[in-house]
Curated annotation (Swiss-Prot):
Residues 89-108 are annotated as: Disordered. This is Uncharacterized protein C1393.12. It comes from Schizosaccharomyces pombe (strain 972 / ATCC 24843). One of its GO terms (cellular component) is cytoplasm. It is found in: Cytoplasm.
Amino acid sequence: MNRRVTLGALAAAVGVGYYMTRHNRQASSRLEQKNAEIVRAVENEGQRFDKAVGETTEKAKSYLQSGKERVVDELDKPRENVKNVLSEAQAKGTEQAEALKKGTSKWF
């Protein structure tokens, strides 16, 4: 009888030990799944952030490039001769003064 009790207790202990290892294994696999989900979420957010930074960088680069092109275009335009502009302004001023003296000015 004593041997039977010992074997029963030993079998019960083995059963409880087996149950605990299976139970802990399931918990650890659930924990591993949660960790994997968290890692995936962090990686996805990181990729999204990298993509947003890349798009912003490309936009800034294209904006600067277009600004540079506009400045170059303005500098490449032919400049007016200052003497010609001054002589034109003087001629128009003289013309208006004469028209004012005659009373035929369209402005005054």
